[in-house]
A protein has these predicted regions:
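Extracellular/luminal low-complexity segments enriched in Ser/Thr/Pro
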Residues: 111-112, 224
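C-terminal interaction module
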Residues: 162-253
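Intrinsically disordered, low-complexity polar/charged tails and linkers
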Residues: 1-107, 115-182, 238-253
Length: 253
């Protein structure tokens, strides 16, 4: 892979992610250090025997975009023809894993389809350079979750937690209109909204445009499903900004 050939074009959402979806995690980023972001990026370029590093970056007035690369060991099965018989052989191989993250001017860190290993490496690098409390968790309060649901075309499922019931602490409601079910209304007052899955209008509010299916978690983790068509990157970023604007700051990550 040549770094010069890498271009920042956002996450592609091909048909292959239709079932699993593509994730976006929103965090708060506040720097207590005077070190410029450009210097930090230069120091963390992927080189030598580094297991994680930045391979490309781009800057706009609103944000700085980065592509990073790490390596992971996975088990792969290959077939081998031996003495007229097909054998399955398990091998451990090292594979590259690319991730994308954006640092907004207003102090939001967006992780696009970022794996756990990548997130750990990024968090360590940021805290080492900008302070131990520079990255904080964002959280959606119940009213914020309700506000997002009112904007949805259709809510397909909703999960409650912290119900305080002696027999169950969590409950999930599904169906054509789960928020209007009698049981949901009875439990929602005492519990917190853990997550919901809904359809939102995609694009410029054109009714002919296929809706965007999103699962929203209260810890500001989003998962987008394209349905029959890929979800445009611009729609993903617009929705992520809407969520970050109404999120509250929580504990240090």
């Amino acid at each position: 892979m040549q770094r010069g050939q890498v271009q920042l074009q956002g996450i592609p959402f091909p048909y292959s992610v239709r079932e699993q979806g593509a994730s976006v995690e929103l965090l708060k980023f506040e720097s207590s250090s005077e070190q410029p972001m450009a210097k930090w990026a230069q120091e963390n370029m992927l080189e030598g025997d580094k297991q994680w590093g930045i391979i490309a970056q781009s800057k706009t007035k609103e944000e700085t975009l980065f592509l990073s690369l790490t390596f992971r060991k996975v088990q792969r099965t290959r077939l081998r023809l031996q003495n007229g018989r097909i054998e399955r052989i398990q091998e451990e191989v090292t594979e590259p894993e690319m991730g994308e993250f954006h640092i907004k001017q207003e102090g939001c860190l967006e992780l696009y389809s970022y794996g756990a290993k990548q997130k750990t490496a990024l968090s360590k690098s940021l805290t080492d350079s900008f302070g131990n409390d520079c990255v904080k968790q964002l959280f959606l309060q119940k009213d914020a979750m309700k506000s997002l649901m009112t904007e949805a075309i259709e809510v397909n499922s909703i999960s409650l937690t912290a119900l305080g019931n002696p027999f169950f602490n969590d409950a999930t409601f599904t169906g054509t209109d789960p928020t209007n079910s009698k049981t949901y209304k009875e439990l929602a007052g005492s519990g917190e909204i853990k997550s919901f899955r809904a359809k939102f209008q995609s694009g410029d509010s054109d009714a002919s445009t296929a809706p965007m299916i999103v699962t929203v978690h209260s810890n500001c983790k989003l998962r987008f499903f394209g349905g029959q068509v890929p979800v445009p990157q611009s729609d993903i970023e617009d929705f992520a900004k809407k969520v970050s604007d109404i999120a509250s700051e929580s504990e240090v990550v």
